Amino acid sequence: KIDKFYLLKVYKKDNKFLLIKNTKFNFLKNLKIFPMNEIEKHSNLKKNLNFKISNMSMNITIQFNKIKGSIPNSSWIDSSKLDSYTLPSFTKKIFKYLKKNE
């Protein structure tokens, strides 16, 4: 298994979260995900989530950010209406985690 580390950026406005169309990673291609970057493993980073996707273990650190300007290929998703969106289970699990850890 490959261990990978990601910094997931959460932008929240009222009850809405910003998602982007994934064009960066080979997994979940063209689906709506939270903006994130692959990072080096740092011992001082707090790991919030771990996902196993095929042969990869994803260690995810969550960072809350203020929106500055516009982010390409993005849209605001109302977290109280998640069922009305077509989202990958990966994204839904992150929503569930955020709701539980508000």
For each feature predicted by the language model, list its residue ranges:
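Intrinsically disordered, low-complexity, charged terminal extensions of DNA damage-control enzymes
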Residues: 1-102
